[in-house]
Amino acid sequence: MSRIEPAAVSGNVFQQMMGHRPGIMEKWFALDESMRFQGLLSPTLKEEVRRSIADGIGCRFCASLGAPDPDSHDRRTALAVAFAQTVFDNFHDLHGLDDEVFAVLKEEFSDAEIVELSIWSLFMIAGQAFGALMQIRPSTAAELDDYKDWRAAGEAAARDAA
């Protein structure tokens, strides 16, 4: 059971929980879509980052949208996922992250890509922490299908724009 009742707005239960503050919800999801489907890093890499931290944070809704697929990770994706997990695990002391973490990232990523990865990881941690805090239930089958369709359309648009 969620800590608060979902707002009477359209969308999935996560959107409905944020829907108590419509202006924030609209901007949050616009930022999500912009970062997810635009930028230097692929939407597929970003999705693996999202999936990799969902279980650890405890957002049941977020985790129900797809489990990580470590078998599909190339070196860049594996490094991105490891970085996001390291950021999450050390969130209480981000100053304490060893410089070696960034040295390894720089073997595969440009500075601009590291910035994008850092912002994406922290944005996902924040959103998923909200889901965990509100104890949002797992997605329904229809919500999962809608999420998959939304991702597929966004990824296709990103490919067409490239």
Task: Kindly label every feature range from the protein language model.
Residues 1-162:
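Hydrophobic alpha-helical segments
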